[in-house]
A protein has these predicted regions:
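Disordered, charged N-terminal biogenesis/targeting segments of membrane/secreted proteins
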Residues: 1-25
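A short, surface-exposed beta-strand/turn
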Residues: 162-173, 243-268, 339-377
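Segments that shape or occlude catalytic/ligand-binding pockets
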Residues: 194-331, 335-344
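Short coil/turn linker and secondary-structure boundary residues
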Residues: 2, 6, 121, 188, ...
Length: 377
């Protein structure tokens, strides 16, 4: 079992390998970066409360006027090459898993955009991004910008900034300490992490002056020792629910601690969404659940869905990974697996919540609708 963050790190490593091979072949700079599979940086003043996925506080009834386009091409669901572990979250109850996903089942959506994955950002554009980031944070003393074959970077004695096709990150060679009253450690409580988020937002506010940003305090699952953890990110708010969904899925900024609870890295997701295929009609969560029980889903979980299984939670998310050709919206269903493979954890009431993905666009637009065949797909 691997968490989202562990799977993401592995995907990042593989995408860099893929990008390097493509770069050598085409003599172009193609960079690789963190990849969001589900499910995993930016800022202003007011933070809403963060709450469980189906909390009563997350019952926005926003609707979108976005209509489906006509003459849309069919889409292909690409298969992974394996080796990523399965996506499972260890918790006593689904309510412990939290995030600030703006979607909920009360929101009416007729269509959502689909994008073709692009990994061809020019080296000059990436250099420009590094320069802009350094200026915003008032970082100085950088040498020339270099290309290591999978990314473009510049570094000083204390900081390294790296830009790729899908993100930019600021790495502190000597991690930044927070004041003693803040707990930013791996296993800090929800309350402590929320306080740390406010401090970090204020300290690095230069990054986030273009609007209001929402705190996405996500996580709540445990490791095999029963230790709960949360993670800090931000995404830009919008009055348009579709844009808000896009911002949440593609343009988050994360603050990452080291083992000592010090700030080690700030990274912002910036994938290129310039190649839009079109606005595709979206099915309802109920229709997606029918497809789920028909076996038409993508999962890394080791077991098939049974008719008797109950879904614990539903989310709308975009997936993107090295093997994907398109950024497509999916419904992500969580299903509890009582057997954790660890007797001690089971005695403590832990379950593993496995993730199953059903394409959210109408089935007729999927050229190869996934069908679970007993193997990791």
């Amino acid at each position: 079992m691997k968490s989202f963050e562990e799977r993401k790190a592995e995907v990042c490593r593989r995408r860099k390998i893929i990008a390097e091979k493509r770069r050598k072949k085409n003599k172009l700079l193609l960079c690789a970066a963190p990849v969001i599979i589900a499910v995993g940086i930016i800022i202003t003043v007011n933070f809403p409360d963060i709450f469980p996925l189906n909390s009563a506080k997350n019952e926005s009834t926003d609707s979108s006027t976005l209509s489906p386009d006509t003459d849309l091409p069919t889409l292909e669901i690409s298969a992974p090459d394996g080796g990523y572990g399965y996506e499972g979250y260890l918790a006593h109850d689904i309510s412990e898993l939290v995030n600030a996903n703006p979607w909920n089942e009360n929101i009416s959506l007729a269509a959502l955009p689909v994008f073709r994955v692009k990994n061809d950002t020019s080296e000059n554009k990436l250099k420009e991004l590094i320069t802009t980031t350094a200026e915003k944070l008032n970082l100085k003393g950088f040498g020339s910008v270099s290309n290591d074959g999978g990314a473009v970077f510049a570094e000083s004695e204390s900081i390294k900034i790296t830009a790729t096709d899908t993100d930019i990150s600021v790495y502190f060679k000597k991690a930044e300490s927070l004041p003693e009253k803040y707990n930013f450690g791996y296993y800090a409580s929800y309350k402590d992490m929320k306080k740390s988020a406010g401090y970090l937002k204020n300290k690095y506010s230069a990054l986030f002056k273009d609007g209001k940003y929402i705190l996405n305090l996500y996580g709540g699952d445990c490791d095999i020792y029963g230790r709960q953890s949360y993670h800090i990110s931000f995404y830009k708010d919008s009055d348009d629910i579709v844009q808000k969904i896009i911002n949440y899925n593609f343009y988050k900024t994360r603050f990452t601690p080291n083992d000592n609870g010090e700030l080690e890295q700030i990274s912002t997701d910036l994938p290129n969404l310039g190649d839009k295929i079109g606005n595709y009609p979206v099915i309802s969560p109920d229709k997606a659940k029918e497809l789920l029980y028909d076996g038409k889903y993508v999962t890394s979980a080791p077991k098939a869905i049974k008719k008797s299984d109950k879904t614990a939670q539903t989310e709308l998310v975009y997936r993107f990974a090295p093997w994907e050709k398109y950024y497509i919206p999916y419904y992500r269903f969580f299903v509890a697996e009582e057997s954790t493979g660890n007797e001690s954890l089971e005695k403590q009431g832990f379950k593993i919540y496995c993730a199953y993905y059903v394409p959210a666009v109408e089935e007729k637009y999927i050229a190869n609708m996934p069908l679970w065949n007993g193997a990791l797909n």
